[in-house]
């Protein structure tokens, strides 16, 4: 049984919600400043409320610190360092300045305890699907560009996602910024030869600092063959094939029977869809994502590799560069939230999302069967092991009629894209 304490009640309540569902742990208390919210949280989760670690009589194995760090004018990183020096494993909620990160990792290594950064967005199913699909396409196509819309409050998770997508955020070259008295400011950077355009909502409502968001984030990665988009942290993830006009003198009249492969594709594919209500995202999705970070701290915590630490430090440094380019957020007042019921909107037909979610599972099974059938057919006609063939040699070996050669080329491309064969 691991004893865990949570620091902070604002975002800490999501940690408490995650912890209450986990096995093999005991929540020994909530440590906070003693606000009305803190007392209410402690009562709701039926745990003690402390204002100092010295008040805690039980052993503490792990501390979840959900308090603003120095980057946001808080004491979260200092609290984490104090706990690490006491030999307590620590999970510190993002964002964290790279200098504070370096100090925490160094103390953790000296004390032989675990230190990690909490970042629930990386654990969300839609984000995981997006990252995996970017890697799939990147095996055969080069990233041409990345476009990002975001609220600066979640800029750290966005940078972390880009770090997973690109594997490195160096070298970071600032191409230019457009800032002014407008809600969204833009910044363009280049990482290697990949341009990334950020459009950031960089305002803070002085009466509602945490709640004034026009959006969280949206990320689009462009390739020669299309664009992959994560529309929201909770989905959907959509692939839009690139528009490419056929090289024909007569286009509409000949597409019915002589369309190129790209013209036979849908104009969009839903790769992940989850039409959950917002309350279920807060109630279930976020706590489940946080639990995955906590498990790394609780279940056999191992010392992170130097390569992993360097990547986290580099991501944090890239975050600092992004925010430096955008500048300080503009303080605004008088803004308000207005709920607009979605049923008032014009909905002319069943959405593509609804149709696709019903068919997606069956399509995946069917596609897999087709791939295996193609592969089996090739194996039946080619007996030699570890021997390379050109596509023309394969076609000749199979004995395909000329009219069906384009289909076999398509087969070979699909099999290669899905790692059944390799170039």
What are these regions (language model features)?
Residues 338-423:
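N-terminal accessory segments
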Residues 97-163:
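A contiguous active-site-proximal alpha/beta segment in oxidoreductase catalytic domains
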Residues 1-45:
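N-terminal Rossmann-like dinucleotide-binding module
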Residues 27, 49, 90, 114-115:
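Hydrophobic beta-strand scaffold residues
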Residues 15, 45-107:
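Beta-loop-alpha module in the N-terminal Rossmann-like domain of NAD(P)-dependent dehydrogenases
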Residues 143-236, 245-246:
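Rossmann-like dinucleotide-binding domain that binds NAD(P)(H)
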Residues 228-307, 332:
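C-terminal glycine/acidic-rich active-site capping loop/insertion
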